[in-house]
């Protein structure tokens, strides 16, 4: 059965919250310098060097889109996980690795 918009937003919001919590922990424990801006369907992370990672809910497609300095990625919900449509990678390890590569900040989820 197809996911409803309500289910999509709940899953995406839970994921956004997990990312925000992990970053707040990194700020406390690693003195990380990250600005978090959650507004509507977008979660934007800005690092001390001015670079950004933007995570965006695409409701019509029920996808999560991520823009990093390394490229853009689209994740769909498959078998209980958010999966990159191009390479099959999972969302949370991807975000963790992207933040580490882009800012040097190690997150724990």
Curated annotation (Swiss-Prot):
PROSITE patterns linked: FRATAXIN_1, FRATAXIN_2
Protein name in UniProt: Iron-sulfur cluster assembly protein CyaY
GO CC term, one of those recorded: cytosol
Keywords: Iron, Metal-binding
Domain of life: Bacteria
Biological function: Involved in iron-sulfur (Fe-S) cluster assembly. May act as a regulator of Fe-S biogenesis.
SMART domains from the UniProt entry: Frataxin_Cyay
GO terms for MF: ferric iron binding; ferrous iron binding
One GO BP: iron-sulfur cluster assembly
Entry similarity comment: Belongs to the frataxin family.
Gene3D superfamilies linked: Frataxin/CyaY
Source organism phylogeny: Bacteria, Pseudomonadati, Pseudomonadota, Gammaproteobacteria, Alteromonadales
SUPFAM superfamilies recorded: Frataxin/Nqo15-like
Pfam families, A to Z: Frataxin_Cyay
């Amino acid at each position: 059965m197809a996911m409803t918009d309500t289910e999509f937003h709940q899953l995406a919001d839970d994921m956004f919250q997990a990312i925000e919590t992990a970053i707040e922990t990194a700020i406390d424990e690693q003195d990380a310098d990250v600005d978090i801006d959650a507004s509507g369907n977008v979660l934007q992370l800005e690092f001390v060097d001015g670079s950004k990672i933007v995570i965006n809910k695409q409701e019509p497609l029920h996808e999560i889109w991520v823009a990093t300095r390394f490229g853009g990625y689209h994740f769909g919900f498959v078998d209980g996980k958010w999966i990159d449509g191009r390479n099959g990678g999972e969302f949370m390890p991807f975000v963790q690795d992207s933040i580490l590569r882009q800012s040097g900040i190690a997150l724990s989820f």
